[in-house]
């Protein structure tokens, strides 16, 4: 009971720390101005060390969040929480490089078995997309000598509360289903004024504000199968998230302000107006091969057709295309049962990912490439501290676009204990 109290207290403290310290500064990327922002990979920090590999490879040690069909591997009660930190350099031809750092809650979750090693349930809270940017640009005044300067800022995103159920149907075949409650709040603001006017000339700010919110449900399915080949296993997995029309509302307002921010004129263009956000379905496949508890190598592929996306009320032009993500990853544990050598019980991971994002800017689809590595440090009996790292870049300097060179750190804590939910016995 004392161990359980420590685990619960530690987990709750980690979750509270995640919300209070990093959630408000979720991301910084000019590309997140598009659509509903940056789409977040759902994999927990442990699999982020392998580039996000997780559609076919289940684990007893961490939350199986990438494919609900693998939940039966979580055979004991589990609490898991993770955060992500990122530092990046943003470059564009003709401008000075800009450095930024940000962080956010990566996930908070619990899972427990309904039938040990056969059927498990999980509850997961994590972001689906993140908006975070603040930048400005100037364009020449038509038939004039001054510039129009526009400041852009935005924050928020879409979040998911996922209820998942997964279990064995036959000895090697498992199925899973998830229902996600999607909710969001996105705020964007565009402020424009004429730069360079004489001091005795009236100058005003034109402020365009938009707020978007949504809440609704969407469904997802998963399947997994494995073949025994000698002492090793060949694992296959697939996921399918259904396309969803998410119910929402939006608010648009146009204001004329003095330079100190006092409103002169305001016009509400839309007030709590009904809107539906069409989120594309997801199809994913995975294959992996390895020896349980020792080593594994695998590959994943996921795609979404963002051409169907509908729901943006942004005043800027937006273009979308099909997104695709390719992942290669591997993990190795020298000796999971070693008593004398702690380093042999550590699980080491490496991976790489190539992501064709859904965003098309100036006729160019924005790509993201990353190299990943990480490890899991075992603590107590069945728990671990998980670390994942990613070095990569997104975008290009060609065609007057923006390139982001980034370094991401994923940290997670997983607490497993088979005494949770066990009724105490008294003599």
Where are these regions (language model features)?
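Bacterial Sec-dependent N-terminal signal peptides
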Residues: 1-29, 427
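Subset of outer-membrane beta-barrel
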Residues: 25-427
């Amino acid at each position: 009971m004392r161990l359980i109290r420590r685990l619960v207290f530690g987990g709750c403290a980690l979750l509270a720390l995640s919300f209070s310290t990093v959630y408000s500064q979720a991301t910084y990327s000019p590309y997140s101005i598009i659509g509903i922002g940056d789409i977040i990979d759902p994999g927990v920090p442990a699999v982020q060390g392998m580039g996000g590999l997780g559609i076919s490879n289940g684990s007893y040690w961490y939350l199986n969040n990438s494919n609900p069909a693998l939940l039966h591997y979580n055979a004991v009660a589990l609490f898991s929480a993770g955060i992500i930190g990122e530092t990046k350099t943003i470059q564009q031809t003709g401008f000075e490089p800009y450095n930024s750092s940000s962080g956010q809650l990566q996930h908070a979750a619990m899972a427990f078995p309904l039938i040990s090693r056969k059927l498990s349930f999980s509850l997961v809270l994590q972001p689906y997309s993140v908006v975070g940017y603040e930048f400005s640009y100037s364009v020449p005044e038509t038939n004039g000598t001054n510039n129009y300067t526009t400041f852009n800022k935005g924050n928020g995103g879409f979040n998911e509360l996922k209820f998942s159920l997964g279990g064995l149907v036959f000895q090697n075949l498992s199925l899973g289903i998830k229902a996600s409650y999607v909710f969001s709040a996105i705020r964007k603001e565009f402020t424009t004024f004429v730069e360079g006017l004489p001091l005795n000339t009236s100058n005003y700010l034109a402020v365009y504000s938009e707020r978007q919110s949504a809440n609704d449900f969407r469904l997802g399915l998963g399947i997994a199968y494995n073949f025994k080949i000698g002492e090793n296993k060949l694992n296959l997995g697939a996921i399918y998230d259904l396309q969803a029309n998410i119910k929402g509302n939006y608010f648009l307002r146009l204001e004329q302000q003095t330079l100190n921010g006092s409103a002169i004129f305001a016009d509400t263009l839309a007030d709590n107006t009904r809107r539906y956000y069409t989120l594309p379905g997801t199809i994913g496949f995975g294959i992996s091969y390895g020896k349980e508890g020792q080593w594994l190598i695998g590959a994943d592929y996921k795609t979404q057709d963002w051409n169907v996306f509908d729901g943006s009320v942004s005043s800027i032009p937006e273009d979308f295309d099909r997104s695709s993500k390719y992942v290669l990853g591997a993990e190795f544990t020298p000796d999971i049962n070693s008593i004398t050598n702690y380093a042999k019980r550590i699980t080491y991971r490496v991976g790489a990912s190539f992501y064709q994002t859904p965003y098309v800017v100036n006729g160019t689809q924005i790509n993201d490439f990353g190299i990943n590595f990480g490890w899991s440090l075992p603590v107590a009996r069945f728990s671990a501290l998980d670390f994942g790292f990613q070095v990569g870049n997104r975008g290009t300097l060609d065609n007057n676009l923006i390139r982001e060179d980034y370094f991401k750190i994923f940290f997670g804590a997983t607490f497993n204990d088979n005494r949770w939910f066990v009724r105490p016995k008294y003599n």
